[in-house]
Curated annotation (Swiss-Prot):
GO terms for molecular function: hydrolase activity. The active site is at residues 100, 150, 181. Induction: Repressed by MhqR. Strongly induced by stress due to exposure to 2-methylhydroquinone (2-MHQ) and less strongly induced after diamide or catechol stress. Not induced by oxidative stress due to hydrogen peroxide or methylglyoxal. GO terms for biological process: catabolic process; response to toxic substance. Keywords: Aromatic hydrocarbons catabolism, Cytoplasm, Detoxification, Hydrolase. It is an enzyme of class 3 (hydrolase). This is Putative hydrolase MhqD. Putative hydrolase that may contribute to the degradation of aromatic compounds.
Length: 200
């Protein structure tokens, strides 16, 4: 997968996953804001929708192509495994930071694979897939940033994702913003403060 890697000085690795139309550079500044010392691994989605990179196909707005989602989730997991060898970082210290479509593929990693991530910061995610048995996520720290008036990820959707994670044992937290789907500076600050407490 097309990506950029910036070496840090700590053991943590931030896996940066952009929203629709973004690229591997989009969340570098956010990653450095959250953890100035972490290694940064920015990844570009390999699916194109009207020329815009995404991490998996969708059938329509808010309706995911679940078969493609499963395939792309496995591809991303395999890529992380390979990148850990290529760049010589600690595979057990990977924390996802995703926005929108990137948050959805990060959530899908959690839904499909046990111990695939050390933690996750999900900005405006949806429930990636329903009707599957989720792995044990005992104690896994997960931050969900949600907008009370988000037209793409409704309040009900955010709460449903939180319940799935919580019921699978994750230590999940939802941080609500008064706005919509945009990622605000205040939300980024909340994510950073959460990270300082939750990721050790």
């Amino acid at each position: 997968m097309k990506h950029i890697y910036e070496k840090g000085t700590s053991d943590n690795v931030l896996l940066l996953l952009h929203g629709t139309g973004g690229n591997e550079h989009d969340l570098l500044s956010l990653g450095r804001f959250i953890d100035p010392d972490a290694h940064l691994l920015g990844v570009r989605g390999s699916v194109l929708e009207n020329g815009m990179p995404r991490f998996f196909k969708r059938l329509s707005e808010g309706v995911f192509d679940e078969k493609d989602l499963v395939v792309r989730t496995r591809e991303l997991k395999d890529f992380i495994d390979e990148a850990a060898e290529t760049h010589q970082f600690n595979r057990g210290r990977v924390i996802a930071v995703g926005y929108s479509n990137g948050a959805n593929i990060a959530a899908s990693l959690l839904f499909h694979y046990k111990d695939v991530l050390k933690g996750a910061i999900l900005h405006h995610p949806m429930v990636p897939i329903r009707g599957i048995e989720l792995p044990d996520m005992a104690g896994l720290p997960v931050f969900i940033g949600a907008g009370k008036y988000d037209p793409l990820c409704t309040k009900e959707e955010s709460e449903e994702l939180y319940r799935y994670l919580r019921d699978s044992g994750a230590s999940a937290s939802v941080y609500w913003q008064d706005g919509g789907h945009q990622l605000t500076q205040h939300e980024a600050e909340q994510a950073r403060e959460w990270y300082k407490e939750a990721i050790v």
